[in-house]
Amino acid sequence: MLRGRRVVTAVTGVGVANGAMVTALFIERFHPTEVLVSGTGSRFNPRIRTGDTVISTKTIHHAAGNLTNQGMVYRKVRGPLAGQMTSWYYRPDTRLLKLARAAVAGYEAEPVTVNGKAYRPRVLAGEVAASDMFGVSDAKIADLKAKLNPDIMEMESAAIAQVCTQLGVPHIVFRAGSNRTQSNPGNDYRKLGQTAAAAAARWTVYFTGCLTAVVKR
């Protein structure tokens, strides 16, 4: 039990294939009422600080489509069923998104200290992009900024959102910013990843309690 609700937690591992596989097995085995995705991501939006948690309003496969000399051209691809096409982006469940937006006002994040500066992280709505790329080049960053301009980049949520959507399970994605988006994030992620993961987890636990309160009304 967590905040009055029966929950099952699963660790996906890194990457879109792992995210999709674990989500499909999770749904098949446990038949969840909804799926909450909690984790970290690099800060594409410079206004997002380490520990700020983004409620995803749109979760994007940023490597789905054609890679041309002018950068990515995003497009649908064929799904597992005959005649089915899958999108390159997914929206969260409207009910969960409405509840998450409303829950922000009552949430007080734990203070963090990053690079000697103490502050209280925020929770805000934004867009999340995902692929199997851990680091991305300056050229890729420029292309992403011109075409998508996401707030957070990570490696699983688009695949998780796709599986949830195709299997008819409501979902919502929460990702806290860690390091800035860059070509070689390893050292920065090791320094900042735990702070971001803890921030996302605290918000997710709080939101779980909000879901419990709604059910009891």
Which residues fall in each region the model found?
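N-terminal short beta-loop-beta anion/metal-coordinating cradle
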Residues: 1-30
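Solvent-exposed, acidic/flexible segments
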Residues: 12, 16-19, 89-93, 153-154, ...
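Extracytoplasmic/secreted envelope proteins and their assembly/folding machinery
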Residues: 20-24, 52, 97, 201
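Structural motif
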Residues: 34-36
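A C-terminal functional module that forms or caps the active site or interfaces directly
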Residues: 130-173, 182-183
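His/Asp/Glu-rich mid-to-C-terminal helical/loop segments that flank catalytic regions of hydrolases
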Residues: 181-217
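Mid-sequence, gly/pro-rich, charge-dense loop/helix-turn segments that line enzyme active sites
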Residues: 45-147
